[in-house]
Amino acid sequence: MPINIPVHLPAKQILESENIFVMDETRAFKQDIRPLNIVILNLMPKKIQTETQLLRMLGNSPLQVYFTFLIPSTHTPKNTSREHLDEFYTTFESIRHKKFDGMIITGAPIEHLAFEEVSYWKELQEILDWSKTNVTSTLHICWGAQAGLYHHYGIEKIKLAEKKFGVFEHLVKEKKERLVRGFDELYYVPHSRHTDINTEQLKNTPNLKVLSVSEEAGVCLIVSDDDKQVFLTGHPEYDTDTLKQEYERDLLKDDTVKKPVHYFIEDGDALVPVNRWKAHATLLFMNWLNYYVYQETPYVWE
């Protein structure tokens, strides 16, 4: 996919160096095709890193895609410059009248808070309600998945006794679902979270399908019956070294922090991360974009 991004977005140079096809607005304007419009609600603290990770996942399809980056107006990010936010981001008020083919809601490192304690919770609820009528399919990631399941279905999150941290094996349960088309029966996903969803409540909730699970990490992939809501409890978009960065960050605060499991190999005295999830992660995002967005979205929104 020639992903269509602003000329000066920091991710552009990184993705081009990785041989991922990107185009700027000038070239995209000359192509006479109907592009997809995807809005990304970026709740992660490192905005540029998350932008790059998600655009990398969406950069290998023949479709042209426009991206709109969104932040809550009721929260001021502390780890991204005001200049970057002003140039590349907008708020819900400026887009609420629009229709989008797809939406991605990222995770956020705020699991210790009850949903109602989150500063932008009411705004997020409004966005989630809006997505049901203004977006063809919404992909919720990690905390974003927990928030979406709680808001749409009343499924609560529960605190884990120990952080779920590492790269975990998952089993595909619903092999005929389009979202996992082409998957091996077993695949890997990084997880980094202190909470989980209430699986008993999930079992008793109609209109939701569990597509994959892990013996160690629990439920990973959930889809609504109409394919409009996709919930992903892990972080398949993560770079090879993202868990390593989080581990080193946490070690500075607590030297008893356990290292992520099933992730490092030892090379002498060094711990080297190994990426075992990239191929399936790319396929997951491509399947969502093709089958749940492109194949389902109207050519002209009414």
UniProtKB/Swiss-Prot annotation:
Protein name: Homoserine O-acetyltransferase
E.C. code: 2.3.1.31
Coiled-coil regions, chain positions: none
Record's function text: Transfers an acetyl group from acetyl-CoA to L-homoserine, forming acetyl-L-homoserine.
Molecular functions per Gene Ontology: homoserine O-acetyltransferase activity; homoserine O-succinyltransferase activity
Pfam families reported for this sequence: HTS
GO annotation terms (biological process): L-methionine biosynthetic process from homoserine via O-succinyl-L-homoserine and cystathionine
Pathway stated in the Swiss-Prot or TrEMBL entry: Amino-acid biosynthesis; L-methionine biosynthesis via de novo pathway; O-acetyl-L-homoserine from L-homoserine: step 1/1
Originating species: Bacillus pumilus (strain SAFR-032)
Active site positions: 142 (acyl-thioester intermediate), 235 (proton acceptor), 237
Record-listed substrate binding positions: 163, 192, 249
Superkingdom, taxonomy of origin: Bacteria
Claim: Acyltransferase is one of the keywords in the record: yes
Main localization of the protein described in the UniProt heading: cytoplasm
Cross-referenced NCBIfam families: metA
Annotated keywords: Acyltransferase, Amino-acid biosynthesis, Cytoplasm, Methionine biosynthesis, Transferase
This protein's GO CC annotations: cytoplasm
SUPFAM superfamilies according to UniProt: Class I glutamine amidotransferase-like (SSF52317)
Location of the protein in the cell: Cytoplasm
Catalytic activity from the UniProt record: L-homoserine + acetyl-CoA = O-acetyl-L-homoserine + CoA
Similarity field: Belongs to the MetA family.
Keyword Transcription: no
Site (Important for acyl-CoA specificity): 111
Site (Important for substrate specificity): 192
